[in-house]
Amino acid sequence: MRVLLQRCYEASVSVEEEVISEIAGGLCLLVGFTHKDTPETVDYMAKKIVGLRIFEDESEKMNISLAERGGAILSVSQFTLYADVSRGKRPSFTKSAPAEKAETLYDLFNQKLTEAGFIVETGVFGAMMDVKIVNHGPVTIMLDSDEMRK
């Protein structure tokens, strides 16, 4: 599982030029799954994200988590996080989980974040979306469950 986490002042998702979800501060998460991801992977990543200390304290050090600070989450499915561009000029997405599995895990991920007490807005799984993000910092962090659990 990969999550591109962006700390933001605001973020929104539009489908066919209509805003369907938006937040006014917190985290924008672009979320992708691979074949070997499981509900346990989802649980691990959700807990990791809500506990990450990526907001500044009064000393301007990243020392406060979203759980401590408060804020919303915009979660957007993003199978292209598993693009393989090692050969040729066209990306391959064979490392991405099949849509049915990915959608199940994506729904579970959003449920875990909601159960942790956050307002979670989402995109539309599998849809062509326009995502607008006003980064705060900017702070952008790539989380990869394979790298984190070694």
From Swiss-Prot:
Keyword Hydrolase: yes
InterPro entries named in the record: Daa-tRNA_deacyls_DTD, DTD-like_sf
EC code: 3.1.1.96
One GO term (biological process): D-amino acid catabolic process
Compartments it resides in: Cytoplasm
Chain positions of motif Gly-cisPro motif, important for rejection of L-amino acids: 137-138
GO cellular component terms, semicolon-separated: cytoplasm
Source domain of life: Bacteria
Gene3D superfamilies found in the cross-reference section: D-tyrosyl-tRNA(Tyr) deacylase
Keywords: Cytoplasm, Hydrolase, RNA-binding, tRNA-binding
One Pfam match: Tyr_Deacylase
Catalytic reactions of this protein: glycyl-tRNA(Ala) + H2O = tRNA(Ala) + glycine + H(+); a D-aminoacyl-tRNA + H2O = a tRNA + a D-alpha-amino acid + H(+)
Signal peptide as annotated in the record: none
GO molecular function, one term: D-tyrosyl-tRNA(Tyr) deacylase activity
Primary site of residence: cytoplasm
Subunit structure: Homodimer.
HAMAP family membership: Deacylase_Dtd
Family indicated by similarity: Belongs to the DTD family.
Domain remarks in the Swiss-Prot or TrEMBL record: A Gly-cisPro motif from one monomer fits into the active site of the other monomer to allow specific chiral rejection of L-amino acids.
Role of this protein: An aminoacyl-tRNA editing enzyme that deacylates mischarged D-aminoacyl-tRNAs. Also deacylates mischarged glycyl-tRNA(Ala), protecting cells against glycine mischarging by AlaRS. Acts via tRNA-based rather than protein-based catalysis; rejects L-amino acids rather than detecting D-amino acids in the active site. By recycling D-aminoacyl-tRNA to D-amino acids and free tRNA molecules, this enzyme counteracts the toxicity associated with the formation of D-aminoacyl-tRNA entities in vivo and helps enforce protein L-homochirality.
Protein name: D-aminoacyl-tRNA deacylase
Originating species: Listeria monocytogenes serotype 4b (strain CLIP80459)
